[in-house]
């Protein structure tokens, strides 16, 4: 299932839907985007802790898969279904100890302390709800394939317990996402490409755990992955320009560029690869790479070795396809257009550059504030 929060530009989402991906969403905004993109309601997985009653009603009407995150959501959904004679296909999110710390236990129902089984019992006591899946999401940028194997094994144990007690088959296991891209984490001594597992490694760990869990062959659950970063990060590039070169008080070279953390949110945790876009000096120097924003935290790279750049030189930032176009912000500068390059090399503008008119569209000024003298 394509993770909408990773990059929800319509053109990007439709690329993955054309390849057969369902939609995985965590808000009604993303949910409606998926519907408008042509995804059938039954192929939308509705995750997240913030589902209102109105959100749940829409998901029920469209026969979507509702992943219940907490008891309040469970009770709210159960009451609505019972009062209105509706049916819903549901799953629960399960958090668990996989040996990775800190543990992501703020979402879902805990495996070890019995919360997950208690939630399952409550669901199975409501004939209006059909428990069809089990879901987990154990972390982000996960480098341990063994953690996925442990998570898969624990979900399998729950699925077998459901079968034994209620004679009900869990139709799918959703292992969530968190698969790493080749970006390098800040503070890492090794490049990301040297330490991340391959998708084959992730697949081997997960599928081996499921195949070895003891399911009858004809009752193996469907495996769902909520892939985002690992699929789109590599495909995204940010193009920018050098606007100034200066020396800091300690003598370090500083290069100021026309893109900042407002556009490159992931620079807070990645040391993005940056390269010149033209023939450049053979000499190089360590430098700080600053964005143009009027705040001291606008740092793209705290230390990077690059050729000696000049004002007007162009740069390319690599692997920016994940989370930057959903977490970017309009601050000081307006956001640029986004271009998709087709398989035949044809460029397509898939999001236009913002303008002052764009930003004012949702503003309203009271009449008494429209006249003043300075």
Language-model features: locations:
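Active-site-proximal beta-alpha core segment in soluble small-molecule metabolic enzymes
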Residues: 1-172
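Conserved active-site and cofactor/substrate-binding residues in soluble primary-metabolism enzymes
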Residues: 7, 72, 111-114, 118, ...
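Short acidic, glycine/proline-rich loop/turn micro-motifs
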Residues: 101-105, 184-189
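Glycine-rich beta-strand-to-loop/alpha-helix junction loops that act as flexible
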Residues: 138-139, 173-182, 225-229
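Short, electropositive alpha-helical surface patch
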Residues: 144-158, 188-200, 233-243, 372-374
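Alpha-helix-loop-beta-strand connector modules within alpha/beta enzyme cores
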Residues: 155-157, 161, 199-214
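Conserved "cap/hinge" positions at secondary-structure junctions
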Residues: 183-184, 319
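Charged (often Lys/Glu-rich) extended helix/loop segments that serve as interaction or gating elements
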Residues: 205-207, 211-374
């Amino acid at each position: 299932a394509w993770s909408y929060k990773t990059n929800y530009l319509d053109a990007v989402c439709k690329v993955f839907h054309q390849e057969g991906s369902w939609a995985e969403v965590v808000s009604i905004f993303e949910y409606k985007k998926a519907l408008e993109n042509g995804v059938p309601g039954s192929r939308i997985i509705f995750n997240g802790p913030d589902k209102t009653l109105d959100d749940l009603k829409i998901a029920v009407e469209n026969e979507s898969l509702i992943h219940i995150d907490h008891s309040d959501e469970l009770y709210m959904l159960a009451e609505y279904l019972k009062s209105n004679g509706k049916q819903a296909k549901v799953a629960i999110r399960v958090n668990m100890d996989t040996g990775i710390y800190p543990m992501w236990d703020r979402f879902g129902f805990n495996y070890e302390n019995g919360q997950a089984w208690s939630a399952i019992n409550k669901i199975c006591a409501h004939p209006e709800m059909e428990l069809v899946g089990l879901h987990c999401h154990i972390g982000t940028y996960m480098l341990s394939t063994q953690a996925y194997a442990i998570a898969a094994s624990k979900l399998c144990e729950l699925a077998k317990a459901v079968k034994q007690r209620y004679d009900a088959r869990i139709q799918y296991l959703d292992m969530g996402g968190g698969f790493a891209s080749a970006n390098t984490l800040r503070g890492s001594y090794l490049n990301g490409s040297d330490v991340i597992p391959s998708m084959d490694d992730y697949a081997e760990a997960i599928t081996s755990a499921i195949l070895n869990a003891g399911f009858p062959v004809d009752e193996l659950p469907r495996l769902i992955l909520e892939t985002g970063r690992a699929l789109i990060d590599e495909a995204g590039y940010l193009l920018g320009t050098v606007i100034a070169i200066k020396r800091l008080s300690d003598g370090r070279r500083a290069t100021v560029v026309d893109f900042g953390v407002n556009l490159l949110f992931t620079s807070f945790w990645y040391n993005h690869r940056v390269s010149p876009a033209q023939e450049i000096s053979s000499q190089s120097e360590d430098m700080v790479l600053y964005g143009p924003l009027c705040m001291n935290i606008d740092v793209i790279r705290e230390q990077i070795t690059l050729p000696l750049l000049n004002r007007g030189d162009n740069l390319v930032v690599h692997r920016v396809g994940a989370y930057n176009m959903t977490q970017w912000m309009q601050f000081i500068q307006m956001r640029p257009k986004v271009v998709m390059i087709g398989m035949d090399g044809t460029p397509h503008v898939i999001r236009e550059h913002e303008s002052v008119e764009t930003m004012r569209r949702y503003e309203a000024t009271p009449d008494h504030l429209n006249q003043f003298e300075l």
